[in-house]
């Protein structure tokens, strides 16, 4: 089970939002590269970056911070990034800069042809981000709910060749209410590619629950507010996941 610390970037700083609201931002660090180093030193095997300004602007807005993070840890672990990726040129720029994966969210829903082209041009490097509330997909930094069912879109995007799916339950993100295990497993069972859970991770019990469903295709979980607020000790959580995986492998 991959525990993936999130570094959300707003105006060059590392912040956390409550339910995607840019006006409810808590600044956790003015040095995102140092934050990246901290998580890697604590045992992170992948990092999840979000360009929050980019998500709302539709183009890259935190390049300096992203490049600083990649300079710091990009040679050691894979780094993935979402937010504002709307063109093949942007995908190429980010991959050339050293990102391992780019996450396409809103653009995948609004312009599936772009996602298909990206998967063809950059096979193995494209993750799709599906944000949902009550099973329906949301776009544009969560500000718009669509009529699309998550599983329908996931199956379509799997056919395009996406590497994996980051699935966020909007109702729970930044609220420390626990991961929506049921919805995440339902999605993972419907597709043949890995699903990364996101939104609501709050404690070690969530880690236990996720490890139990890893065999269904839930590959990892993005760790956000809980590891910044101190509700969840990241190193202890990764250790717990590794121990559980060992027990399950030996069972």
From Swiss-Prot:
Compartment annotation: Cytoplasm
A GO biological-process term: L-tryptophan biosynthetic process
GO cellular component entries: cytoplasm
Catalytic activity: 1-(5-phospho-beta-D-ribosyl)-5-[(5-phospho-beta-D-ribosylamino)methylideneamino]imidazole-4-carboxamide = 5-[(5-phospho-1-deoxy-D-ribulos-1-ylimino)methylamino]-1-(5-phospho-beta-D-ribosyl)imidazole-4-carboxamide
EC number annotated for this UniProt entry: 5.3.1.16
UniProt cross-references to NCBIfam families, sorted A to Z: 1-(5-phosphoribosyl)-5-[(5-phosphoribosylamino)methylideneamino]imidazole-4-carboxamide isomerase, PRK13585.1
Coiled coil spans: none
Annotated metabolic or biological route of this protein: Amino-acid biosynthesis; L-histidine biosynthesis; L-histidine from 5-phospho-alpha-D-ribose 1-diphosphate: step 4/9
Tree of life domain: Bacteria
Name by which UniProt lists this protein: 1-(5-phosphoribosyl)-5-[(5-phosphoribosylamino)methylideneamino] imidazole-4-carboxamide isomerase
Key word Mitochondrion present: no
Family, per entry: Belongs to the HisA/HisF family.
KW Cytoplasm (keyword) present: yes
Main location: cytoplasm
Family annotation (Gene3D superfamilies): Aldolase class I
Species of the source: Burkholderia ambifaria (strain MC40-6)
Molecular function GO terms recorded: 1-(5-phosphoribosyl)-5-[(5-phosphoribosylamino)methylideneamino]imidazole-4-carboxamide isomerase activity
Keywords of this entry: Amino-acid biosynthesis, Cytoplasm, Histidine biosynthesis, Isomerase
SUPFAM superfamilies associated with the record: Ribulose-phoshate binding barrel (SSF51366)
Cystine connections: none
Location of the active site: 8, 131
């Amino acid at each position: 089970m991959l525990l993936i610390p999130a570094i959300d970037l707003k105006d060059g700083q590392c912040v956390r939002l409550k339910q995607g609201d840019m006006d409810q931002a808590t600044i956790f660090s003015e040095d995102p590269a140092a934050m990246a180093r901290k998580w890697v030193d604590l045992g992170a095997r992948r990092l999840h970056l979000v360009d929050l300004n980019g998500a709302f602007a539709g183009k890259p807005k935190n390049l300096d911070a992203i490049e600083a993070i990649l300079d710091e840890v990009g040679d050691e672990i894979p780094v993935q990034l979402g937010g504002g990726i709307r063109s093949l040129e942007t995908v190429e720029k980010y991959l050339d800069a050293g990102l391992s994966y780019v996450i396409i969210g809103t653009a995948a829903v609004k312009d599936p042809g772009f996602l298909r082209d990206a998967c063809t041009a950059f096979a193995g490097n494209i993750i799709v981000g599906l944000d949902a509330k009550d099973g329906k997909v949301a776009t544009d930094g969560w500000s718009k709910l669509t009529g699309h069912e998550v599983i329908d879109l996931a199956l379509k995007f799997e056919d395009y060749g996406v590497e994996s799916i980051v699935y966020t339950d909007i109702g729970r993100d930044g609220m420390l209410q626990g991961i929506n295990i049921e919805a995440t497993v339902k999605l993972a069972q419907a597709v043949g590619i890995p699903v990364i859970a996101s939104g609501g991770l709050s404690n070690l019990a969530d880690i236990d629950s996720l490890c139990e469903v890893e065999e269904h295709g839930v590959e990892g979980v993005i760790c956000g507010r809980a590891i910044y607020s101190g509700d969840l000790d990241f190193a202890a959580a990764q250790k717990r996941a590794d121990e559980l995986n060992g027990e399950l492998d030996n069972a």
